[in-house]
Amino acid sequence: MEILRAEHVSYSYQSKYQKVEAVKDVSCSFEQGKFYAIVGESGSGKSTFLSLLAGLDQPCEGTIYVQGEPLSGMDRDAYRLNQAAVVYQAFHLFPLLTAQENVMLPLEFKKIKKKEAASQAQRLLQRVGLESRIGRQFPKMMSGGEQQRVAIARAIAAGGEIILADEPTGNLDSGNEENVVALLNELAHEDGYTVIVITHNQRVADETDHVFRMKDGCMEQVR
C-alpha cells in the first residue's frame, strides 16, 4: 500500500547571492513495510527533500500526498506527532531526562497518563533492543548506538507509519551502525513501517529494498 507520494515537487530558496533550486521536479512513491535509501553527494538535495516529506518545509511547486491526502492541507505538527517520526544524525536527547523519560515525552504530549506512558516507553525501549536498565540511564551514560536506539524509540512512541531518518548512523562506529540498520530493517519488514533514510554510506544503502539517487536536486531510482 502506498503511504507517501511526491508529484513534481520542487523547492528553491534565495541565498545571499543567488536563487538555489534545491529540489527539481521530483516524483516518487513509498510503500508500507519497505526500507528506502536516498543517496547522493552533499548539496544534492537529499536532506531538503526529506524535510519536505516531514512537513518541515513546503514545496514551491508540486504536491506531497500522505495516504492520498495532500500534506499541504494537514496540520503538519500533528502529522509529525502522529504519522511521521523524524530521526537525525544528532540524537537530540534531553540530557537531564533518563532514556525512559525521553521516550515518554511524545506520549505525554498526547495526554497519556504518566503510568501508562512509562509502561509504553519501557516496551518501546525493549522493542529497539535495549535492556531495562538503560531506561534508568541518562544520555551521557550511554553509547552512541544506545542513544540512537532511544531516539528511534522516542520517534515511534506516538504511533504512525513513517520513519524519516537523516544520516541515522553518521555518528556511529561500524558495529553500532550495523545494529541500527538491522533495527530499521526490522521496523520496516516486521512492524510495517515505511522507513526512508538519507545516507552517504553505501553499506547502509545496500541493506535497503529500494535506492533513490539525488544529484543537483534531481532524483532517479537506481534500485
PLM features: what roles do these ranges have?
Residues 54:
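Helix-to-loop junction immediately C-terminal to a conserved catalytic motif
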Residues 62-71:
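Conserved ABC transporter NBD signature motif
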Residues 71-85:
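ABC ATPase NBD coupling module
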Residues 97-105:
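Short coil-to-helix segment of the ABC ATPase nucleotide-binding domain corresponding to the Q-loop/switch region
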Residues 115-133:
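Conserved ABC ATPase "signature" region
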Residues 138-142, 146:
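Conserved ABC ATPase signature
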Residues 159:
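Conserved catalytic motifs of ABC-family nucleotide-binding domains
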